[in-house]
Amino acid sequence: DDIWQGLKFVELNRRKAAKRWTDLLEAGLYQRLEEFWPQAYEIIGDILIVKLEDEVVSHQREIAVAMLEKHPSVRLVCADNGVHGEFRVRNLTPIISRDGDISTLTKIREGGKLILIDPTKAYYSARLSNERLGNLTSAKKLAKILDRPISVCDPYAGVGPAMASIISSPNLVDYALIGDLNPDAVSLLEQNITNFTRKLDTKIVIKLLCQDARLWKKTHDYLAKIDLLLVNLPHDTVNHIPELLPLMSKNTRSLIRGWAIINRDQ
């Protein structure tokens, strides 16, 4: 065809897409340490977190480069060193960044909402997303029963994933008492709450606290106001609920949703 005359033709060999990140490692290296390569990893926003066995730590850069190539949406690969501190936050070591940015601040999307999170500063678990969806369903049912917007309390809110869909739903909530004991979590929570409510036409009264929730009963303005109480503190839920009951509304239908881990011998 005349239209192609004068153009240079280049024949390209099509590279078969890797099914696993390990397919991108040098074959000899992979085979030599085959039993030690990480089989699982976690992606939070644009951060990939992987736990490395001692036998492959010296090859962490090769691992991270392969993972970046396998996951184009990942910006940063970090080694997982477990959790630490009073608030059990992630101890992460950045290995490699796609663009040079090694910040562990990222965003995740849940329930259609973007949530700002830093796993090195505040706890977050994607595994509880179904439970949080159940919170929204329960909140809507309770509002329908009461025939009015409800008041909500989340005393162990972290960065606010449980509030994302509830507080952003039009005409569902008119009062929210929210907090956490971790000041870093509350700082992120404040930013997230602002984003969750930005497009609402109705005003919500929001009290945001960085304090042990068991002390909230000592503040008169917080008493007998809450229709829906969320208790996401699995190891201490049973012990904390009695301290939170004074916050609950009286003489109307109310609801407590929480999770508890209880030993079989209890």
Briefly describe each language-model feature range.
Residues 1-266:
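SAM-dependent transferase fold signal centered on methyltransferase-like domains
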